[in-house]
Curated annotation (Swiss-Prot):
Gene giving rise to this polypeptide: PME11
SUPFAM superfamilies cross-referenced by the UniProt entry: Pectin lyase-like
Protein task: Acts in the modification of cell walls via demethylesterification of cell wall pectin.
Name of the protein in question: Putative pectinesterase 11
Primary subcellular site in the record, as a coarse category: membrane
Subcellular location: Membrane
Chain intervals for the UniProt region annotation (Disordered): 332-352
Membrane topology: Single-pass membrane protein
Active site: D175 (proton donor), D196 (nucleophile)
Organism, scientific name: Arabidopsis thaliana
PANTHER family for this protein: ACYL-COA THIOESTER HYDROLASE YBHC-RELATED, PECTINESTERASE 11-RELATED
Length: 352
């Protein structure tokens, strides 16, 4: 999404969230059929229909998109679906359509379950994984766009409300994560890129995430798009870790009222002393909301920070320090603890 180009050698950091999916999946499956239609308030969030994806042919499907296509439209929000992706490298472009909410896509470990594609230039068409459905959850999966340094190459686009990501690795170079619109939550994720690698107009909370910059000189971690002072969108980074090579800004404004806050986060010396960039438009210095609160590390020194960024007071920071920022208490849900087999018409006919 950025205007400047960088040419450093791309490398994927040796960082993985080694979190093994609960083995109770195998022992909790029942043979119950799909529940009848019901209102959202009557969903049993403890139980999901389980669909297995396994390249070896031992699952219900061998490709992730096939598993998604097997799920019927679910606009009455009556059923949770849990797609369990066995370890492997899945080379495909995946889309979750709007008419299929309440899907969880889960790898086994982010270190051995990969969704990879290579596409670039078009920010809306290049994503390896695109989410259009609400109430989506992704766990323990590595999502990569391997297009390289030549232009925009989105690994993940989130264009729906109420999406959560846990223990995921998301990597590309430019525009890695298009955090497009809606309320979103990212926890214990690793996100890597060089230019505007977290961008978009969503309202998102990033908690205990590791952000790694590949930019050799003056890249930007964020490019948040907020077009008015009354718009509720913005990015909050809470308890995060910023590392990398070269130098990077914390953010620059895609929209005139761009809003980004870093709190309780570690900044390595990869963060440029100025901290923030106005993207060649000094008028935005009067309208953006760029704040830091109790951050630490060599890159957190504010002595040379641009004067139009904020060192937030306790009172100013409060609104950004909890899940209330994204209304998360109303929609974030725990992982299901019980599973049902998919109906026969949903399963791959080749599987006995």
């Amino acid at each position: 999404m950025g205007l400047y180009k960088t040419k450093s050698k791309r490398s994927i950091a040796n960082y993985h969230h080694i979190i093994i999916i609960n083995i109770f999946i195998l022992s909790s499956i029942t043979s119950s059929s799909m529940a009848s239609s019901s209102s959202p308030s009557s969903i049993d969030f403890s139980t999901a229909i389980l669909i297995r994806v396994d390249q070896s042919g031992k699952g219900d499907f061998s490709k992730i998109q096939e598993a998604i296509e097997s799920i019927p439209p679910n606009l009455n929000n009556s059923q949770l679906y849990f797609i369990w992706v066995k370890p492997g490298i899945y080379r495909e472009k995946v889309v979750i359509p709007a008419e299929k909410p309440y899907i969880t896509l889960s790898g086994t470990q982010a270190s051995n379950t990969f969704l990879i594609w290579s596409d670039g230039e078009d920010i809306l068409e290049s994503p390896t994984l695109t989410i259009f459905a609400s109430d989506f959850v992704c766990r323990f999966l590595t999502i990569q766009n391997k297009f390289g340094t030549a232009g925009r190459a989105v690994a993940l686009r989130v264009a729906a409300d109420k999406a959560a990501f846990y223990g995921c690795v998301i990597t590309s170079y430019q525009d890695t994560l298009l955090d497009d619109n809606g309320n979103h939550y990212f926890k214990n994720c690793y996100i890597e890129g060089a230019t505007d690698f977290i961008c978009g107009s969503a309202s998102s909370l990033y908690e205990r995430c590791h952000l790694h910059s590949l930019s050799p000189n003056n890249g930007s971690i964020t490019a948040q798009m907020r077009t008015s002072a009354t718009e509720k969108s913005g990015f909050t980074f809470l308890g995060c870790k910023l590392t990398g090579s070269g130098s990077t800004f914390l953010g620059r404004p895609w929209g005139a009222y761009s809003r980004v806050v870093f709190a309780y986060s570690f900044f390595s010396n990869v963060v440029a002393p100025q901290g923030w960039n106005q993207w060649g438009d000094s008028t935005k210095e009067n309208t953006v909301y760029y704040g830091e609160y109790k951050c630490y590390g060599p890159g957190a020194d504010r002595e040379q920070r641009v004067e139009w960024s904020k060192q937030l007071s306790d009172e100013e920071a409060t609104v950004f320090l909890s899940k209330d920022f994204i209304g998360g208490k109303d929609w974030l849900r725990p992982a299901p603890s019980h599973f049902k087999n998919a109906p026969k018409q949903t399963q791959n006919k080749e599987i006995n």
